[in-house]
Amino acid sequence: KIISGRTCGGNPRQASCYIAAHDARTGKELWRFHTAAGADDPIGDKSWGGAPVDGRSASTWGLTGSYDPVKKIIVWGVANPTPNTRAARHGGNSNAIGMSAPADLYSNSTVGLNPENGKLLWYYQHLPGDDWDQDYTNERILLRTSFNPDTKAVKWINPSIQRGSQRDMSVSVGEGGGLFALDRNDGKFLWAIPFPYDTPRFLISRIDPDGKTWINEDLIVDIPGERHVICSYNTKSYWPMSYHPGKNSLYIPYVDNCLDMRSANPAGGPIPPPPYEIERTTCQGPPLPAGTEAAVPAAAGRGAGPGGAAGDGRGAAGAGAPGGRGGGGAGGGGAAGGGRGGGGGGNPESRTAIRREGSDPQKFAGVAKVNVSTGELTRLFETCSPGNGATLTTGGDLVFWGDLARNFRAIDADNGKVLWQTVLPGSIQNSTITYAVNGKQYIAVLTGRGAVTSGLITQANIQPPPPNTNGIFVFALP
């Protein structure tokens, strides 16, 4: 079988949101599992609070799921529900659904499926009733280890699980933050941490002992013109983490970012000030190759807000911007964001990335090492330059990772010491791989531009790379 996900592009929406299996020889479709619950799903249907079935949406746009051939379970991640806000999905009533799971199933969930028929075996919802377009899709890493979470390192632990017991785990990190360990046999919650940092602005307010998650309702933007900072935001997006069996640890690339979000206000009026100001700093990257020119992102209506924010040109700081375009938004320290609204009067919705309050700009990004048995986290490597590429671990205890300032490096898997580094012509992107030919091991890395590259480069104030730097670079290990 070939298993694949969909991005909800059809009409009606709900019917086009599914994971499907096809016969690998004939291409015949064998089954579908709908990731936005329909009327024929008694548990999932009720979780939508009466929202019209045809308009429900929750896709699997990200990386593919994982398969356990021994247990015969497909484990797959589902993204946020759309429209992005609770009020927009529920006729202006953000309370039409609960603040705890389940809400708007199977959005922001991990689902376990029977590969023979696509039937749901279990689900776990990481973020119920999302209000901010935070995706919990992308990779699920399957591993087996003992359950020994350190109470000093792990905030949320299931007390009913016997310590020291061996568990078949599925571990994942959401775009909005949070590292979750589940039992992949039944979806039971094991433990979770508010990755990459614990903050009162974290999007999940609590997790009950049995694993039920609660959205941080203090940060819901359901009043016209209301403004909040929500953490985190694209903290671990479309760049895979890796698992080192010898260290029993994940190596997670992350960005210490939050979301400065303001709801639309059709009546216009004054725009609330940023919740806090961000110091404008420069991340010093390596010099550009001689004779090249920086590729300055061009977008209509770009402009800097407080702290050097740069929106995507959609969504003005002022009222009545034609087509929703205008300055980079009123948010500070942002990038990769901007407003959503259309033309006419009023203030459109605005979404702008912003560094976490009180964070160190010289430690804006990095690689974290997390022991999957104990949950202990070590910030292995920190830098001012964010990345848009995967980590890769090797049996020789190296971790390869690159950043948007064009640095590609190998660090020690134990202490984070940089053992080797080079500068490439372009920014490092997904995904770094290793392979061998005739006994010789090679590392291959991709450079170019990604969906969030320009925004993060602007936000970190990195010298943009030269244009036309798409390429694949291969290095031989000694």
Q: What are these model-predicted stretches?
A:
Residues 1-478:
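Beta-sheet-rich non-transmembrane sensory/scaffold domains
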